[in-house]
């Protein structure tokens, strides 16, 4: 089991697919990593040598923000918006949709389950 960026990536899968198990690396980034390190995308993780795994690990550490660091960075960005008191920060603070969606109906995921109102039933 290869361990990259603190994640055990599956050994039976192809390298680009396995790399997407790391938070912050999607399909495009995974293919770019394979190309940069010189690994054929059709190879499987269990076929890689230790040197190739090390090269992938070093490339990711040098060029990508992944896992805990990425989560912390996103969390700090949201906190910064909330501290500024800008519109987006207020929407985050009130647990409402941030990107302009309507809230008269819908937005149930963000707002939570509907609250019962007394006398509303017909």
Swiss-Prot record:
In its UniProt record, a GO molecular function of this protein is: tRNA binding
- Which GO biological process entries does UniProt record here? translation
Residue segments, region Disordered: 98-122
- A Gene Ontology CC term for this entry? small ribosomal subunit
Which keywords does this Swiss-Prot/TrEMBL entry list? Ribonucleoprotein, Ribosomal protein, RNA-binding, rRNA-binding, tRNA-binding
Q: Which HAMAP family match?
A: Ribosomal_uS13
Subunit comment: Part of the 30S ribosomal subunit. Forms a loose heterodimer with protein S19. Forms two bridges to the 50S subunit in the 70S ribosome.
**Function in brief:** Located at the top of the head of the 30S subunit, it contacts several helices of the 16S rRNA. In the 70S ribosome it contacts the 23S rRNA (bridge B1a) and protein L5 of the 50S subunit (bridge B1b), connecting the 2 subunits; these bridges are implicated in subunit movement. Contacts the tRNAs in the A and P-sites.
Q: What is this protein called?
A: Small ribosomal subunit protein uS13
